């Protein structure tokens, strides 16, 4: 049996074929930098629990400025985080994907956590659409940097939510245990 080990495999014609993963940017939001074919990307450093109130604010760790490689037809944005209730047993929030400070209306989510739960916010962004449609996150082309992030708020004062917090850890409740989020961008040709 033979083994081939390479650092990077690039097809001769990287624009041919469809449905291929062209690159993946993925990491724990601890301030790391990730280098790919299309550039070097820095993830935010999440070191604290984030308490939401009733005003929309950027979710820490969710922001990335990204340019997909040539030949990309779809970019998949994926943000994994831990959410939980601030005071009572229940929490509800509203979260939305923004691209260059424009709301992707169809991406609206309203996750609710009883005490605490994992949340994955995942959204495909079309890069070769026949027309731009920011309501669903599609563009005729994507050749320069765009900033992607999640904006969120609590449903109301009685349902405040915390991001990046386990709520319970090692037999005790209402902890300040920080769970760092994971951000993943996948470019598909």
Locate predicted features.
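Terminal beta-strand-rich extracellular "head" domains
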Residues: 36, 40-51, 55-62, 67-189
